[in-house]
Amino acid sequence: MYKSDNLKQTDNETFTYIIDKHKDFKILQLTDLHLGFGFISRKKDKLALNAVTKIIHKAKPDMIVLTGDSIFPFLPKAGTLNNRKQAYKLMKFMDSFAIPYTLVFGNHDCEMGSTCNKEELAQIYKKGKYCIFTEGRKELTGVGNFFINLTSSDENVLLPLVMLDSNMYGEGGWFYSGFDRIHDDQVDWCMTRLNDLKKCNPDIKAMAFFHMPPAEFKEAYRKMKLGDKSVLYQHGSIAEKNEHFGI
């Protein structure tokens, strides 16, 4: 776990991180690295690691957030199911930048038959020298639902960063069942926490980090295809335009 005079873990679901409110705080979000660290994925891993290294050196962020599918224990793509080894290698890579980082799980971090489940991966990531992570409440759906409250030196919360586990696959199991989502109990927990913060600052805003796109993404895509000018396309493509996109 990251050790700093500016960071304090107040309970099993909350960190406070003191920042200079007079300076910009830069957060770099990275997603879907799909690092396999196996013989099949060796070439793609090298490309991904080189790209991430260039991005981090150019961006010079104050914090990095990995929003899921960081590792990929999928035999046909990686040549290994050993996500324990993958997690340790990812952690070593991220620690090498000496920048605080945190993460949420995606649907690929713990594939069927992989060595570790999410609870076990959580214990690994908590060993990271620069990693900020906790499992969160056991009674909540998912693993890794927690807050990092960016706070001023006078202990006022400036910006809550909400980490949410958007879970893995649907009720049918793996792949063909579609994807899971952020569950109602997670939303209720999140809003309760935010409402508590609003008692001190009614105008407070928050940022949430998660892997699965919610239904609003599908609605925006539908409007864009219909030529709705209220939707602005910026960059990128959508590979999954079916019922698996936006839930």
Regions found by a protein language model. Give the residues of each.
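Extended active-site neighborhood of metal-dependent phosphoesterases/phosphodiesterases
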Residues: Y2-I19, K85-P202, L232-H235
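Active-site-proximal beta-strand elements of phosphoester/diester hydrolases
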Residues: F25-F37, L158-E171, F209
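Sec/Tat-exported extracytoplasmic proteins
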Residues: H34-F37, I56-K60, M94-A98, L194-N201, ...
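Active-site neighborhood of phospho(di)ester-bond hydrolases with catalytic His/Asp-centered motifs
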Residues: Q29-T31, I64-D69, Y101-N107, M207-F210, ...
